[in-house]
Amino acid sequence: MASLNVYNLPLDKRLTKHLLRRACFQYSKAQLDAMTGKTPAEILTQLNVSKSYAWNWPNDPVTNGSGANPSCANKQDGYWLNDTNWQNNSYTCRQGPKRAMVAGWWWYNVIKQNTLIDKLTWFLFTTFTTAKDDGAGKAGHFFDYINLLQFYSDKSVKDLARKITFDNAMLYYLDNGDNNKNSPNENYAREFLELFTIGK
């Protein structure tokens, strides 16, 4: 079994590549050359520095057609998550495309940012998972869920497990609205514990 002692020696190119492949989404030859010869702690500190890149907000520029919901006609949502003048009357419109926009927004920004926090957020996304397509509910719920994962990515997993039980996307994904006191296997708590914490 590998030692659990902190490895404080400078990394050669092979070990630096190994660390970078696991700690970020991509790296350049210039980054590899600059980090080779540094200790793991120095490299991780460098990867934790936020870039000056400003995150753009998800934007829905499309005018909603009438489709199956006539109340959606001729409404543009634009930056619906952070627009203080946005009217909530079209919130039910285009939730599928909006969830896809949030997912695309997240991926675009993490690739640009490319920090350890982003890689850890992705790890938590694959651990405390919900479904992007209808499984997370409204697009705003999916957006909040990603931000929750990002906030706790370098903090306590126990705290995240507690907080995520109040998250709308997770509650929707695990059918909290369908709890049944007469069927112990059909409730949110059992599903959450089995899937994400203690198992069966």
List each model region and its residues.
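N-terminal module-boundary/linker segments of secreted carbohydrate-active enzymes
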Residues: M1-M101, Y108-T115
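Primarily short, surface-exposed interaction patches in extracytoplasmic proteins
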Residues: V6-Y7, L11, Y27-A41, T45, ...
